Amino acid sequence: MPGWPWGLLLTAGTLFAALSPGPPAPADPCHDEGGAPRGCVPGLVNAALGREVLASSTCGRPATRACDASDPRRAHSPALLTSPGGTASPLCWRSESLPRAPLNVTLTVPLGKAFELVFVSLRFCSAPPASVALLKSQDHGRSWAPLGFFSSHCDLDYGRLPAPANGPAGPGPEALCFPAPLAQPDGSGLLAFSMQDSSPPGLDLDSSPVLQDWVTATDVRVVLTRPSTAGDPRDMEAVVPYSYAATDLQVGGRCKCNGHASRCLLDTQGHLICDCRHGTEGPDCGRCKPFYCDRPWQRATARESHACLACSCNGHARRCRFNMELYRLSGRRSGGVCLNCRHNTAGRHCHYCREGFYRDPGRALSDRRACRACDCHPVGAAGKTCNQTTGQCPCKDGVTGLTCNRCAPGFQQSRSPVAPCVKTPIPGPTEDSSPVQPQDCDSHCKPARGSYRISLKKFCKKDYAVQVAVGARGEARGAWTRFPVAVLAVFRSGEERARRGSSALWVPAGDAACGCPRLLPGRRYLLLGGGPGAAAGGAGGRGPGLIAARGSLVLPWRDAWTRRLRRLQRRERRGRCSAA
């Protein structure tokens, strides 16, 4: 963005030169050749040109011989102050003939919107006043603040000392009192005020909010308070009746757009507004557009565009909000949070699929169909959510498939919605093949009854403690019955280490025939017993696996035991079994 455009313009020629068009502007002043945003400002214009001037006094009502408001040839209306003709017009605005003091007349120019002022000038058609005050408003005329004063007697008119030659003594700009305009040889005079004269040297507009506020105005007012007199400045009776006359009121400035626009336009209602760029909006480009709030709004400078950034929502949201805490945590890079993510997405950036959907790896994240429904089977799946990456639904025991829609190998469909797939049954031993008859069962085993507490001493006496799931009915193998099992967890193992995975549980045939232990397919059990079996071809046809013989304990599994067994396992590893 160009540096601060100071210019103290003292003659009509220099005023015209400042407002004349310069070299051709680039195609898009708000972006460089590569399309990157950069700070930009509208050109310097006469903000008062063609604007209505509100004068507190104008001659012609009632009509006189020299001034008649109803006759265009003899009218001296305030419109002559800002007409496009400027100094070329032979007519001047003229106040009424003021018969007595105070001889105050005000000229107010509403600019239509906020401008950043550079200068104010006014040409007088008669001897210039000896006392003039310049005021500005930032709220369209509701309140006023002084810009500067011009007087031949600053202390008398405004109670101020004359302006020092090197500008304000303080750190910021202030309204100073300058010498009154001098009369020209032709009897006219020129009031020329530069905003630079009221500001300390070296103050940069880009980095000084105080200076930005100082030069901002929506209205400018010129107050003519005392005509020029040859004698005592307090003796107004010597000049009455008196009439002020002036023309060519100029307010040089730039449309205030905070560095985010290179021009101002009229909206549909005829109001002057900035043609905002960089994702900004508003009459002065003073805020970010609704979806451009990934970082807070800032005024553009010559070094940094501070463009408002669109929220990163991957095309799945139309609204977002700014979160300062997230912005700080990101190193002041991003603070946007997407709202109402569409297309089954979720997250701050709509970057993952919502519950019940998963990412389609064959589509881009910005694709409207990037998230596919899990479509988990209502009976075979244990829930409606699936893995966000693979789409795999959580299946019930014995169920398989991406959507849990079929039974796993070795399982068959049941009529139960709780357990839709059960283990395919394997024929067990018959009475003819069993060496023990039911009436002999009491001599073989007594099933465990009631509650059972697992103490450290009992835990340490067993060669192994494992959780198993029975896969099918037992199969007779000589003096033994073999049950296919899956070892789900190992809490203690013997010399030949028990391992998780598929295995076999060997039960003496006599005990198995009496239902001791009673092992049902699809159920889980806690097995506390002897060590791992011998190699294949062992006694009585027993193969490798686990043994549930006399001295072993088989209990229906309870989930509450897991924590207790893990605690006993840790105590064993610390050597507590030796003490027990």
UniProtKB/Swiss-Prot annotation:
Organism: Homo sapiens (Human)
Gene that encodes it: NTN3
Disulphide connectivity of cysteines: 92-125, 255-264, 257-274, 276-285, 288-308, 311-320, 313-338, 341-350, 353-371, 374-386, 376-393, 395-404, 407-421, 441-514, 460-577
A Pfam family annotated for this UniProt entry: EGF_LMN_ATRN
Residue span, Laminin N-terminal domain: 36-254
Record's keyword terms, sorted: Disulfide bond, Extracellular matrix, Glycoprotein, Laminin EGF-like domain, Repeat, Secreted, Signal
GO cellular component, one term: extracellular region
GO biological process, one term: axon guidance
Database matches in CDD domains: EGF_Lam
Motif stretch (Cell attachment site): 500-502
Highest taxon above the source species: Eukaryota
Protein name according to UniProt: Netrin-3
